[in-house]
A protein has these predicted regions:
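Ribosome-associated RNA-binding proteins
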Residues: 1-196
Length: 196
């Protein structure tokens, strides 16, 4: 290994997304103080982000699935997977093994990069946006529904003629909704202001 190769390896591994730095430098100490715990391991942290797009047109038109897959890959910065039906449902004309959507799971640096783009770029592009309802699942995980994936600047409207809805799940290590809400607020998630 030459000296230049060693230098590039060091700088590549030293890269840290802005939101990850913010978590370590400001959010974590604030959480420890507010929760009254001393160990950083006891504080909640973001573990992964799961993004899912359901494509009902995939039954008749496989191109719709390819478009959704390409769009989700562009949004997430990581290859997406095709999700298939686990069982047959005759009312929906669905057979086991049919493609029904695409999904991607983000961890590490990509997770923080996506969350930063989502909060700072995509959310302000939502029409009449007043903030999200804090819809947690009882175990500190936040679920958000997005009506149009066009809010992401990576999507080309010419190549993607149909607007797809998305489900985004922020999986945290929080034990309850109160701790999960606290973590997401400190990370900058825009929640609706409660009417007092």
């Amino acid at each position: 290994m030459t000296k230049e190769t060693k230098k590039t390896t060091k700088t590549a591994s030293a890269y840290q997304p802005t939101l990850q730095k913010l978590y370590q430098e400001k959010v974590l100490p604030a959480l420890l103080k507010e929760m009254g715990v001393k160990s950083p391991m006891a504080a909640p942290k973001l573990e992964k982000i799961v993004i899912n797009i359901g494509v009902k047109e995939a039954r008749e038109d496989i191109k719709a699935l390819d478009i959704a897959k390409d769009d989700l890959t562009a949004i997430a910065g990581q290859a997406s997977q095709v999700r298939r039906a686990k069982k047959s449902i005759s009312n929906f004309k669905l057979r086991e093994g049919m493609p029904i959507g695409v999904r991607v799971t983000l961890r590490g640096a990509r997770m923080f990069e996506f969350m930063e783009r989502f909060i700072n770029i995509a959310c302000p592009r939502i029409r009449d946006f007043q903030g999200f309802n804090p819809s947690f699942d009882g175990r500190g995980n936040l679920n958000l529904g997005i009506k149009e994936h066009y809010i992401f600047p990576e999507i080309d409207v010419e190549k993607s003629p149909k607007a797809y809805g998305m489900n985004i799940t922020f999986v945290t290590s929080a034990k309850n909704d109160k701790d999960g809400t606290l973590l997401m607020q400190y990370m900058g998630m825009p929640f609706k202001k409660s009417a007092k």
